[in-house]
Amino acid sequence: MQDIVQDALDNAEAEQREMDGDGDGDEFGDPRIVIVGCGGAGNNTVNRLYNIGVEGADTVAINTDKQHLKMIKADTKILVGKSLTNGLGAGGDPSMGERATEMAQGTIKEVLGDADLVFVTAGMGGGTGTGAAPVVSKIAKEQGAIVVGMVSTPFNVERARTVKAEEGLEKLREKADSIIVLDNNRLLDYVPNLPIGKAFSVMDQIIAETVKGISETITQPSLINLDYADMTAIMNQGGVAVMLVGETQDKNKTNEVVKDAMNHPLLDVDYRGASGGLVHITGGPDLTLKEAEGIADNITERLDASANVIWGARIQESYKGKVRVMAIMTGVQSAQVLGPSTQKQADKSRRELQDVDSKQRAADDAGAGGFGGAHSDGGQDEVEQENGLDVIR
């Protein structure tokens, strides 16, 4: 038996060297992953991702603010709603951001045409990000992609932005397969004494690392592989998702890395009873099968008994003596994302807006002699022509 084990070890080393040498082979093709940043916060995340580099993913920045877009680095940049905003932004009005993005849907369809997995990142509560994210998600879904929303919510003191964020989250949840929400209020607990610019950069970095981790889990070869089909099986279950990331160099890897992952600083969720879980473990050549299985087991033990759990593992020389775990749990419960109080507020806000719209329509009908006040932008072709898009690739 010892001879068999030794032969297996020798063969495994030879196979690993061959796989490492063949890592760039592309004859079978890879899923196309696109990361779309909407509005100021989304653009900042895309800019950070572009700078740190994401293997196998394209970055797209969409904004109504021309000056901010100029400062962003991305594979593709799209200025939307130029005829509406003159490139000066949406003024904190989500309906303006929504309309501007709808005007550019022909261009966005072209950019996302062959995408398999699309991340849509934005800050909820502003104008462009809140309005654009659901539109981009809808377009990506219609093109056949799996869509994951990755958004942050405003501080509690920003009351008007909070109401807008709730309504935006409701729309995004309807259009995306899953949404991962990070709470800006947690920055007050996590990095209370950092200068405000650096504190927000922490949020950008966490979102960027999350997207990078998911993307490279799919595109990079692993010992126990996770592929696009696995991601689809988990993300298709929809709802709110949570991303857990942990890393340790402790000798007790199995417990410590899970403990580190559980202490996620920026999302208040209870993932007991989650409907799905995808776990990816990265370790050095010293990572044992028992340790890897133990980590996957510990991090998923609170999930529902019928939860669909898929796990994989990758060995990297640079991780010798340490281990990293990345987990996505879908179908979790979060008071931040349309919990009872949030849903009630969103319903109330929507009713108030509908009442205002109804009164306005009645007034328009009366002024038009009863022929109705309906009007359009002249159809998609005309709107596209008037939009004055700036697309930089």
UniProtKB/Swiss-Prot annotation:
GTP binds at G40, A41, G42, N43, N44, G127, T128, G129, E158, R161, D204. One of its GO terms (biological process) is protein polymerization. CDD domains: FtsZ_type1. Residues 367-376 have a biased composition (Gly residues). Coiled coil: none annotated. Residues 1-28, 339-393 are annotated as: Disordered. It is found in: Cytoplasm. Signal peptide: none annotated. Belongs to the FtsZ family. NCBIfam families: ftsZ (TIGR00065). This is Cell division protein FtsZ 2. It comes from Halobacterium salinarum (strain ATCC 700922 / JCM 11081 / NRC-1) (Halobacterium halobium). The lineage of its organism: Archaea, Methanobacteriati, Methanobacteriota, Stenosarchaea group, Halobacteria.
